[in-house]
């Protein structure tokens, strides 16, 4: 008989797309950048999404579970299928990011890919290594604590409130969240906290007291450099 965990895994896969890697932890997270839920198939995907995609101002959009074929040096095989991440930069440039079990630094180069329609073209390929993900784990853990505050803002637009908070940030330049709450005319402080969390994800501001385990009124921040 299937366990409750396996049933939940099956429902998640059915609702958000079947992934080939289903033996690791599955994560269902809300993406501010895409304004939609994401199905992430491992802890490594979670780390990379938080630290290098969601919070990266140079990344416009991304797609996990992107099946594509990469050209290899083996003449017998020619192209090898991989499950990767399609990344679109704010410049419009496309890259293929591939989380691997390799060690060492991230390797980036132009590779030849065969697309689903059979066309072949060169795209920048980045091999994301285990060693690199280890260096990003603490940062992603801090961002993970912001997700509940960001998720409460989902599917809603707060243009006037965001403008008020942003103007306040520009005036204060640095401080704690309590000071932002006290300096704005937004009545609901949870909306202010949610907007601040969203701005951290978007790279507008950065959290400066990195040793703190919680996110709240006493969290310190500063404006990011343009």
Regions found by a protein language model. Give the residues of each.
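Electrostatic, structured charged patches in enzyme active sites and in nucleic-acid/phosphate-binding
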Residues: 1-226
